[in-house]
Amino acid sequence: RVQRLKEGYTILPTMQKLAAFLNSDSDKNLPFVTDLGWLMASEVIASGLDISFAPVLDLDDSRSSVIGDRSIGDNPDQVIAIASAFIKGMNQAGMQATGKHFPGHGGIFADSHLTFSQDTRSLSELESHDLRPFDALKLQLGGIMTAHISFSNIDKEIVTFSKFWLQ
């Protein structure tokens, strides 16, 4: 869905299509995901770039028009397993991964680049669902990209400017 570099690059499946393929026998298919992470990172590095803002760690709760099929899925354990394999491939190619969109953009419909976006879920709801991939993968990530969302029951500031979320 969002692959900025196209001409001369391998067109990769969306993460959701990849996850659907993997559901048939995910443990045996994870090395394929590692290979895709390596392939993407290798091609980007070969073109002189040293970063890719991947992978998307948002959970797809079928509410977000922005995240959609860029998400691996709605199951935190599946997202963790597939993202970890993809990150491993990126790292093997020599690229750090950037997990996005912390702490999770999958629960709202609006495009936070175009309009103010607010999520009213509690911290405990986020901790048991959306935050799980970020927490599980934090030591594998070179960085995170924040969501431009206000989680108004936690902090009125959007995450990008929130001391609560950034510290």
Regions found by a protein language model. Give the residues of each.
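Enzymes and membrane/adaptor proteins characterized by extended Gly/Ser/Thr/Asp/Glu-rich
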Residues: 1-79, 106-119, 147-156
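Second-shell residues forming the walls of enzyme active-site clefts
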Residues: 78-167
